[in-house]
Amino acid sequence: MAYDRAADFLEPIDFAEHLDKIELYLGQVCHIAGISKMQLDYWTNKAQIPTKGKKQRIYDIDALETVMLIKQAKDKGLNLGAAIDAARRFRELR
């Protein structure tokens, strides 16, 4: 019964409030997006996706979203340039 009373003090956590604090390494972004490290390196340079870090690239949640939008567009048949443009336009419209 003590456990039930303690649980009454807890409130749901709104993760949206904390997304800007998330930092992901290259391998994590690749795993989440389903792409290779070579693809991510190339896309990061080609699309000028901002990263932090000097020795290792660190991506924020916005960069991850951009990568996933590019992947989605490529999966639908767009070439890389068109996929990058589509991802940019999509993000601008939101």
Where are these regions (language model features)?
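Arg/Lys-rich, alpha-helical DNA-contact motif
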Residues: 1-31, 45-50, 61-94
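Short, Lys/Arg-rich nucleic-acid/phosphate-binding segment
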Residues: 53-58
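Key DNA-contact positions within bacterial/archaeal DNA-binding proteins
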Residues: 38
